[in-house]
């Protein structure tokens, strides 16, 4: 595991328990933006998060990060508590199950029907298999995708 992945896991271990319902921890990213290191913690709730929510969560999360010993951060960083936005990542089976009926983007480790990327409506997620309806040029098609082949999945905006 590389240093950044280790930091993300350490952060997840201390942050996840303090984020209480109705909030949900969606993702954690740590990396350089410009010359600054940024720790981004993506949080959501059913009706969406507000600016006040992010301020309240920052007051809860920031002190908890200071309890990680030894300090895993190699340099100073900015803490960003934010919404995952319209193209929210679907990183768990529960997140995928919650996206049934929605328009999603799925990247695969291995091609199905010579395609490694599908974008369409998630019709079902049962027994570790996604069933999606997508457009192939002008025709609607359905594809079944084993969850084990999914490299990345996220909600998508239909244009």
Curated annotation (Swiss-Prot):
GO biological process: ribosomal small subunit assembly; translation
Keyword Magnesium: no
Localisation per UniProt entry: Cytoplasm
Gene3D superfamilies recorded: Ribosome maturation factor RimP, C-terminal domain, RimP-like superfamily, N-terminal
Entry GO CC: cytosol
Keywords: Cytoplasm, Ribosome biogenesis
InterPro entries: Ribosome_maturation_RimP, RimP_C, RimP_C_sf, RimP_N, RimP_N_sf
UniProt-listed SUPFAM superfamilies: YhbC-like, C-terminal domain, YhbC-like, N-terminal domain
NCBIfam families for the chain: PRK00092.1-2 (NF000928)
Function: Required for maturation of 30S ribosomal subunits.
Family indicated by similarity: Belongs to the RimP family.
Protein name per UniProt: Ribosome maturation factor RimP
Organism in which the protein naturally occurs: Streptococcus pneumoniae serotype 2 (strain D39 / NCTC 7466)
């Amino acid at each position: 595991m590389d240093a950044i992945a280790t930091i993300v896991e350490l952060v997840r271990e201390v942050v996840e328990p303090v984020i209480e319902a109705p909030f949900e921890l969606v993702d954690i990213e740590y990396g350089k933006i410009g010359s600054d290191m940024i720790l981004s913690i993506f949080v959501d709730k059913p009706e969406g998060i507000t600016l006040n929510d992010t301020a309240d969560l920052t007051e809860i999360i920031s002190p908890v990060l200071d309890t990680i010993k030894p300090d895993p951060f190699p340099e100073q960083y900015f803490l960003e508590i934010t919404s995952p936005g319209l193209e929210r990542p679907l990183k768990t089976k529960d997140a995928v199950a919650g996206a049934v009926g929605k328009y999603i983007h799925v990247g695969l480790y291995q091609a199905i029907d010579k395609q490694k990327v599908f974008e369409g409506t998630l019709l079902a997620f049962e027994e570790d298999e996604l069933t999606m309806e997508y457009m192939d040029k002008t025709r609607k098609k359905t594809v079944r995708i084993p969850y084990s082949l999914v490299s990345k999945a996220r909600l998508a905006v239909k244009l």
